[in-house]
C-alpha cells in the first residue's frame, strides 16, 4: 500500500445521499443529509436535537493548507499521512473534556469513522475567535514594524519575540467577507474590535448583544481547559482559533456552541515546554510547516504579502515539496495527537473505502 493510497486528498466525491451541493472547504467537505435521512438518524440514534434538525456528514481530508494555499509533495503525495485522523482525534478529545468541565456542547453528534463527524447544522457566528497567550507569528511581525494596537488592545513597549503576555488577549477577526459594517473593511479575515462587534452584533450573527460576553467566556474557558491539560504533557498552548454557532436542542431552545475544530495543530500553536524554557521553540503544530515554507522559497514575501496572491497560488501549484518535509509534518501531527489523546493514531490503508462501508452498512446513507 503506497503513501498516496493512505492519504485522503479528495473528500467531496463520496456517494453519500444528499439533495444539496457538497460544500468543499480547504480541509473538510460537508454533505447535507436529506430531511428524511436527518429525521431517521435522529430517531434511530437518539441524538439530543429537535426531530426536524438538519444534519450533515462532515468528512475531513489529509490536505495541507498554509498561507491560503493547498500544498503537495513529491511522488504525487497530495496530503499529509495521518493528518485528518489526528486532527479529528484531538478535537474529539477536547470537546469531551469541555463537556466534562461543564462547558458548552459542540456541533458533533456522532463519530462513525476517524475521518467523519455527523454534525447538527449551526448558524455560525461570523467571527474567528482568536486568543493569544504569547506574542509570536503575525502579531510579532506587526509589532516589529511598529504596530502597538491590536483589535482595540494596546500592547506595551519592549516586548520580546515569543514572550508570554501579561494576560490572554482576545484578537478576533472576521469570518468571511462581511459587508456594510462601519469601520470593518470588506475583506476576509480582518481584525476587529469588541466595539465593532457590540455595535453590529446582529451582522456578526449574534442573537443578542449579551451573547458577546458568553462567547468570550466560552473562549477563555476553553483555552484554560486545553492549556491546563497540555501543561501536564509538557506542552504550551500558545494561541488558538475557535469558532462558535447557534443550534436548537431537542426542546427547541437556542444555545451557543463550539463548532469546527478546537485545540488542533492546524488551529493553534503548541510549543514544547522544556525547549521553551531553554530558549528554543519546538513547534508541535502547523506553524513549523509555515516556517519551512518561508525558508524553502527564495522570496518569502510572496507567502506573506496579500497583494501577491496570484504568485502565491502559482507557487503552490507548480512546486512539489520534498517528501521529507511532508513526512516530518506527518510525524508532528501523529506524535502530538498521541500525546494529547493517550492513544496512537492508526493509519487507514484505504480511508475512502472504509468511510463508504461504514456509512452504507451502519447508517444507510449510501445507496
From Swiss-Prot:
Keyword ATP-binding: yes
Keywords: ATP-binding, Ligase, Nucleotide-binding, Purine biosynthesis
EC number: 6.3.2.6
Organism superkingdom: Bacteria
Catalysis performed (reactions): 5-amino-1-(5-phospho-D-ribosyl)imidazole-4-carboxylate + L-aspartate + ATP = (2S)-2-[5-amino-1-(5-phospho-beta-D-ribosyl)imidazole-4-carboxamido]succinate + ADP + phosphate + 2 H(+)
Family matches, as SUPFAM superfamilies: SAICAR synthase-like
Keyword Protein biosynthesis (UniProt): no
Pfam families per the UniProt record, alphabetical: SAICAR_synt
One MF annotation (Gene Ontology) recorded for this entry: ATP binding
Pathway this chain belongs to: Purine metabolism; IMP biosynthesis via de novo pathway; 5-amino-1-(5-phospho-D-ribosyl)imidazole-4-carboxamide from 5-amino-1-(5-phospho-D-ribosyl)imidazole-4-carboxylate: step 1/2
One term under GO cellular component: cytoplasm
Family: Belongs to the SAICAR synthetase family.
PANTHER family reported in the protein's UniProt record: PHOSPHORIBOSYLAMINOIMIDAZOLE-SUCCINOCARBOXAMIDE SYNTHASE (PTHR43700:SF1)
Protein name: Phosphoribosylaminoimidazole-succinocarboxamide synthase
Gene name, Swiss-Prot/TrEMBL: purC
Amino acid at each position: 500500500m503506497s503513501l498516496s493510497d493512505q492519504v485522503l486528498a479528495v473528500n467531496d466525491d463520496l456517494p453519500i445521499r444528499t439533495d444539496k451541493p457538497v460544500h468543499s472547504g480547504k480541509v473538510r467537505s460537508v454533505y447535507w443529509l436529506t430531511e428524511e435521512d436527518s429525521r431517521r438518524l435522529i430517531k434511530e440514534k437518539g441524538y439530543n436535537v429537535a426531530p426536524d434538525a438538519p444534519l450533515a456528514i462532515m468528512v475531513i481530508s489529509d490536505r495541507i493548507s498554509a498561507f491560503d494555499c493547498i500544498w503537495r509533495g513529491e511522488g504525487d503525495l497530495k496530503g499529509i499521512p495521518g493528518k485528518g485522523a489526528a486532527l479529528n482525534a484531538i478535537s474529539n478529545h477536547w470537546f469531551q473534556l469541555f463537556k466534562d468541565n461543564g462547558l458548552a456542547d459542540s456541533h458533533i453528534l456522532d463519530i462513525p469513522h476517524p475521518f467523519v463527524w455527523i454534525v447538527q447544522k449551526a448558524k455560525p457566528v461570523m467571527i474567528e475567535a482568536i486568543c493569544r497567550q504569547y506574542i509570536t507569528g503575525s502579531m510579532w511581525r506587526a509589532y516589529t514594524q511598529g504596530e502597538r494596537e491590536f483589535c482595540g488592545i494596546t500592547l506595551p513597549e519592549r516586548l520580546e519575540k515569543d514572550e508570554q503576555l501579561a494576560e490572554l488577549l482576545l484578537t478576533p477577526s472576521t469570518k468571511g467577507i462581511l459587508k456594510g459594517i462601519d469601520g470593518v473593511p470588506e475583506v476576509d479575515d480582518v481584525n476587529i474590535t469588541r466595539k465593532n462587534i457590540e455595535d453590529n452584533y446582529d451582522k456578526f450573527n449574534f442573537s443578542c448583544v449579551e451573547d458577546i460576553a458568553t462567547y468570550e467566556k466560552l473562549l477563555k474557558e476553553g483555552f484554560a481547559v486545553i492549556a491546563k491539560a497540555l501543561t501536564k504533557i509538557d506542552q504550551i498552548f500558545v494561541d488558538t482559533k475557535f469558532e462558535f454557532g447557534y443550534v436548537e436542542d431537542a426542546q427547541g431552545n437556542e444555545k451557543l456552541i463550539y463548532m469546527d475544530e478546537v485545540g488542533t495543530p492546524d488551529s493553534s500553536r503548541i510549543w514544547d515546554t522544556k525547549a521553551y524554557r531553554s530558549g528554543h521553540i519546538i513547534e508541535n503544530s502547523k506553524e513549523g510547516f509555515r516556517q519551512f515554507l518561508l525558508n524553502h522559497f527564495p522570496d518569502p514575501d510572496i507567502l506573506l504579502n496579500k497583494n501577491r496572491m496570484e504568485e502565491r497560488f502559482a507557487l503552490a501549484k507548480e512546486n512539489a515539496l520534498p517528501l521529507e518535509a511532508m513526512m516530518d509534518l506527518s510525524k508532528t501531527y501523529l506524535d502530538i495527537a498521541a500525546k494529547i489523546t493517550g492513544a496512537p493514531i492508526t493509519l487507514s490503508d484505504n480511508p475512502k473505502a472504509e468511510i463508504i462501508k461504514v456509512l452504507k452498512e451502519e447508517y444507510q446513507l449510501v445507496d
